[in-house]
From Swiss-Prot:
The keyword Phosphoprotein applies. Homodimer. Interacts with IKBKE. Interacts with TBK1. Interacts with TICAM1. Interacts with TAX1BP1. Interacts with CALCOCO2. This is 5-azacytidine-induced protein 2. Residues 1-197 are annotated as: Homodimerization. Widely expressed. Abundant expression seen in the pancreas and testis. InterPro entries: TBD, TBK1-IKBKE_adapters. Ubiquitinated via 'Lys-48'-linked polyubiquitination by TRIM38, leading to its degradation. The gene is AZI2. Keywords: Coiled coil, Cytoplasm, Host-virus interaction, Phosphoprotein, Ubl conjugation. It holds the Pfam family TBD.
Amino acid sequence: MDALVEDDICILNHEKAHKRDTVTPVSIYSGDESVASHFALVTAYEDIKKRLKDSEKENSLLKKRIRFLEEKLIARFEEETSSVGREQVNKAYHAYREVCIDRDNLKSKLDKMNKDNSESLKVLNEQLQSKEVELLQLRTEVETQQVMRNLNPPSSNWEVEKLSCDLKIHGLEQELELMRKECSDLKIELQKAKQTDPYQEDNLKSRDLQKLSISSDNMQHAYWELKREMSNLHLVTQVQAELLRKLKTSTAIKKACAPVGCSEDLGRDSTKLHLMNFTATYTRHPPLLPNGKALCHTTSSPLPGDVKVLSEKAILQSWTDNERSIPNDGTCFQEHSSYGRNSLEDNSWVFPSPPKSSETAFGETKTKTLPLPNLPPLHYLDQHNQNCLYKN
């Protein structure tokens, strides 16, 4: 556009200079024709001037507009380029930051994994070492066992043990079968008892209570007799110990020079020892009812309490090999005041308290226990033992 404007201006300037240079020719024509042509030229010239001026104005306006648009475009381009660059820079910075964070996290994870691997390697090495030691120990044990087996031929003890174990298992199986049979029998009896009348149940309960009271009384009586037997044995052992002490201390020379009184004392002691062989026998007394009458049973079949008493009597009679019966002169054993204390103030002979009738009820309801029969005075054997000890 500038080039076009410059060309127009140059044309105008050239025309002006040409006009100045040209000399008006002498009119060859007549006056009317020259005037008309001159007027046409002037009008054409003026039109051309007007057009040139208008074109110059348009050119200036266009230049201004072009400059404004150029500035606007440049500003827009700069803004676009600056915004895009900032966004890209921000994106790149964020990406770089994320990459750095990931790198740090991966480094920390790698360090942890390295530490864990090192610790696990240490633990595995220790375990391997311990296992190797155990293997060495086991190998040595196996080698020693092989050597022992080579030296000593294998015995048949394991066969004997196997047979004994089989016998035990067989016996236990038989016992289990018996217990099952007993359990089934008891269940059948229980069902039958449930089907019976309540009156019969009351009778059975009363009989059970009477049996329990009888067994408790018999047990107490057996306990006191056992206590007396133990006291007699204690006295006999003391006399024997004294005799042995005398025999050890006395030498053969003293025995030769000893007076007649010493031999008499030894004879007396030996007679005392013969007297000590008497033991207490167990006599079962029927318990008394609250009305003072003795309890008697019409049936001839023995009660479970009687069987228990017989077993207790057998245990008591096993204390001595040659048991003699004490003459039945109407007197029975009675608890002496000295039996509550330790015999001869010896702490090693302390007897436990007798079982109570309430404790032998085996979880039954508390009932009124039958009173024990009054025991007669002490037998002459206990008094004889005490007299012997007093003299010694």
